[in-house]
Amino acid sequence: MRTPRETDPGSVTVLHAVQPGDGGVARVVVDLVRAQLAAGLRVAVACPPGTALSTAVRAEGADTHDWRAGRDPGPGLVRETRELGRLIRTIRPSLVHAHSAKAGLCARLAVRGRVPTVYQPHAWSFEAVEGTTAALARRWERFGARWADRVLCVSEAERRTGEAAGIRADWAVVHNGVDIARFASDGPPGGSVPTVVCVGRLCRQKGQDVLLAAWPAVLADVPDARLVLVGDGPDAERLRAAAGPSVRFTGAVDDTVPWYRAADVVVLPSRWEGMALAPLEAMAAGRPVVVSDVDGARESLPPDHRTPCLVPPEDPAALAAALGRLLGRPELRHRLGREAHEHVLSRFDVRRTGAAVADVYRELAGARDAEHREPIAQ
């Protein structure tokens, strides 16, 4: 067991290696970077250029480096790994924090234990695929865990999923957090049209296809209801083709706050999650959320909200019933929204998240002072 040591924050350089450069992962990284800079750490970020993340962390004052990495493994993997290795040799970080599967793959191959490394899956890659591809992903995660000083999970459920897959790691669990003040609202929405909002990447994971399948049954109960899908992604064209006139697509937006505030109910019918930000952001805005009964989403809810707000995954009928019930009962919506806000305030404040991650860093940075590590090969 390594013993934490007091470390001057200004002597610690953290390199965040990140792919993807958008969506919830990017928002988590921006919040961490902001907190770490405020704490006096030196922070560098390697991420794809021209992304929302690259723009945001540069604006925060982080040392930002272009890392031209695609989202999935492919023919460019060797080049991407070598490029990240060159950046690491140039930056000489005290610690590397790799976010999501692709950055976790490249960073661990580049470093191979020679710099303290935190790997944060943000939901396991093997949950997104099936068959041989899933088996290969599990096999890599089992092997690659030896090159992570910590595997940092965003929920206990994510950790359990990793353990069940045979990954033997030095685990840490730190829940995602949100900026409560940014998302807080003055009360229920003032509009007269019942509005359901779904914020998330338009992809199979987030389950917008299930939501569109449920929507006709919602309209049967609440004919004037409107559905807003906030975000963009690979399934956008297919989802638009399946949507009726009561469904609006916003595309990618820079600020989701107005959409949460416009919502009567926020929904995220995911097939799997690590711990999604959208439900936390919605609850911070005082909105009730309906989520799928999957790991990571379930863990975000107040325990007594599970009956009205938790539905089986890929079950349009159950999803429609939950949405219709909340749209038809404003007093229930308002009570759940108030309770949701208090729940997030007490458990998911981003300041709590930043402090917990800093504790992990301090332990690993102190351990690095106590041992010799070989330099990264040229």
Positions of predicted regions on the chain:
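Aromatic "clamp/platform" in nucleotide-sugar-dependent glycosyltransferases that forms part
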Residues: 252, 271
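A short, well-ordered alpha-helix in the C-terminal region of glycosyltransferases
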Residues: 325, 332-347, 353-358
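N-terminal strand-loop element at the rim of the active site
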Residues: 15-80, 161, 173
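A short, active-site helix/loop in glycosyltransferases that binds the activated sugar's phosphate group
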Residues: 147-172, 178-182
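Conserved acidic donor-binding segment of nucleotide-sugar-dependent glycosyltransferases
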Residues: 303-317, 325-330
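A conserved mid-protein helix/loop that constitutes part of the nucleotide-sugar donor-binding site
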Residues: 23-34, 106, 194, 198-217, ...
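Acidic anion/phosphate-binding donor-loop and adjacent secondary structure
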Residues: 72-79, 163, 175-193
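Short hydrophobic beta-strand element within catalytic cores of glycosyltransferases
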Residues: 288-292
